[in-house]
């Protein structure tokens, strides 16, 4: 690890604990993981309260939201009273109550406007994808608002498989706009982005002018710039 740091080596695939992503080495010891429900919590008036449900647009969401299958819709302002019958307190936060619950069904008791209700929910081990997608949605809304809908926004997290999925899944919803912003900040690298170039650099090859109806050009799945 010291040599990798001194030489500034990239793509070494050596992680903490001596574990390699290609096998070998010792993995980190098992721990009871904290479960997450995809919400922002705030402690106020002696209760743990949902400040916001992290909810990206379904069409662009990569991760299943743990509250999506709940019979009752949890919303901002709801108070979490207990998990599996054990009450929460100032000293027992939602994170403490959800230790060791990842992938397991738990009963969460909420209160809204003086009425309590229980839901069955399966906590997830990370909210990273949900929060990442919500951030993308916020950026897209900001671009649409600032340009009166004339400019589209696409974020790609890397130039690997995930980034290619990002590009294609967002491209077709934004391609009708006059121009596109392709945001690649903090991208994780990957492959030479030939597929990106092929899609974004497509040129029109034919035009259709019908006697009745609108004219159009092909390929239909290309963006030809403003």
Question: Where do the PLM segments sit?
Answer:
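Short coil/turn segments at secondary-structure boundaries
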Residues: 1-2, 13-22, 110, 209-214
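PDZ/PDZ-like peptide-tail recognition elements
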Residues: 9-62, 141-145
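Cleft-lining beta-strand/loop regions that shape enzyme active-site pockets
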Residues: 30, 49, 56-67, 76, ...
């Amino acid at each position: 690890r010291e040599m990798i740091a001194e030489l500034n080596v990239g793509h070494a695939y050596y992680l903490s604990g001596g574990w390699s992503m290609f096998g070998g080495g010792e993995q980190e010891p098992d721990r009871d993981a904290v479960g997450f429900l995809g919400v922002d919590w705030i402690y106020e008036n002696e209760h743990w309260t949902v400040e916001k449900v992290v909810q990206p647009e379904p069409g662009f969401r990569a991760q299943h939201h743990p509250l999506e299958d709940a019979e009752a819709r949890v919303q901002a302002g709801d108070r979490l009273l207990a998990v599996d019958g054990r009450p929460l307190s100032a000293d027992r936060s939602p994170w403490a109550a959800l230790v060791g619950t990842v992938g397991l069904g738990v009963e969460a008791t909420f209160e809204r406007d003086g009425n309590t209700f229980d839901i069955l929910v399966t906590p997830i081990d990370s909210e990273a994808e949900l929060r990442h997608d919500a951030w993308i949605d916020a950026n897209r809304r900001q671009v649409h608002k600032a340009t009166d809908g004339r400019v589209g926004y696409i974020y790609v997290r890397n130039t690997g498989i995930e980034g290619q999925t990002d590009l294609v899944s967002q491209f077709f919803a934004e391609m009708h706009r006059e121009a596109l912003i392709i945001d690649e900040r903090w991208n994780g690298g990957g492959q030479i982005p030939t597929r990106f170039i092929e899609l974004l650099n497509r040129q029109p090859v034919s035009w259709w002018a019908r006697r009745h109806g609108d004219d159009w050009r092909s390929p239909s799945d290309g963006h030809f710039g403003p």
